[in-house]
């Protein structure tokens, strides 16, 4: 028998590293989760490029008899068995996941989607179009289209206590999941706020894609705050109480 309210757990807390070269030697530095985000401790890099390896917060929601996964994360979490082992701690197998949500389509949120081929994937219709322009031509097919894509716009209720809302800014189709729990509303907001200071100080996101203004991104943060969440889970920082 399912409980009246949903349960929310962070399966993996975000991590982020930068790889580069300083004085001819490789450098690997941990950057997140730290707020505010420090600059990389890397001077000279490959043609001025720093290579990043990291993943987002991956969230498990259990509601109304359904197991929902928000932002499965980078491909290594699936490839090296991290996701199956973490799910097992909750008595679940990958096959027990009923629904996948992508708050947006950047690689660090979506690459392990492949583990749920054919399962329902909720994504904003504008984000689905945006995904076709990312990375390389076949990318959307490899990580998005192999699931049963459920495109939507506006607001979408997917289970008794889980609804999706538009929170554009970081990308043109960014969404957030609002979850009613016994403690109150939990907001899983993806990169609408990269770190908690973005939310608390109404800061513009680090990435604002075409056709979206910084003002739109800030309006999305105000929109989320208007729901009065008791817990906010940003994309790349630890969960916090506003």
Model-derived regions, located:
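Pre-active-site segment of Zn-dependent metallo-hydrolases
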Residues: 39-58, 62-99
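Metallo-beta-lactamase
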Residues: 75, 81, 88-92, 96-108, 115, 166, 172-242, ...
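Metal-dependent catalytic neighborhoods of phosphoester/phosphodiester hydrolases
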Residues: 111-117
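Short hydrophobic/aromatic-enriched beta-strand-loop microsegments
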Residues: 120-125, 187-190
């Amino acid at each position: 028998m399912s409980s009246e309210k949903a349960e929310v757990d962070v399966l993996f807390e975000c991590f982020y590293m930068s790889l580069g070269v300083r004085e001819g030697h490789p450098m690997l530095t941990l950057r997140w989760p730290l707020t505010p985000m420090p600059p990389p401790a890397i001077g000279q890099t490959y043609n001025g490029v720093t290579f990043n390896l990291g993943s987002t917060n991956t969230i498990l929601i259990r509601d109304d008899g359904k197991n929902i996964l928000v932002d499965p994360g980078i491909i290594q979490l699936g490839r090296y068995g991290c996701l199956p082992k973490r799910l097992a701690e909750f008595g679940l197998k990958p096959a027990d996941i009923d629904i996948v949500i992508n708050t947006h389509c950047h690689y660090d949120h979506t690459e392990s989607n492949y583990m749920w081929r054919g399962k329902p994937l909720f994504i904003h219709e504008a984000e689905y179009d945006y995904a076709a322009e990312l990375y390389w031509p076949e990318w959307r097919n490899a990580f998005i289209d192999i699931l049963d894509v459920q495109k939507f716009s506006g607001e979408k209720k997917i289970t008794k206590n889980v609804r999706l809302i538009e929170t554009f800014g970081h990308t043109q189709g960014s969404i957030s999941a609002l979850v009613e729990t016994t403690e109150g509303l939990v907001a899983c907001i993806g990169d609408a706020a990269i770190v908690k200071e973005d939310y608390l100080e109404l800061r513009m996101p680090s990435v604002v894609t075409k056709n979206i203004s910084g003002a739109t991104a800030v309006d999305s943060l105000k929109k989320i705050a208007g729901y009065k969440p008791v817990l906010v889970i940003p994309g790349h920082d630890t969960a916090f109480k506003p």
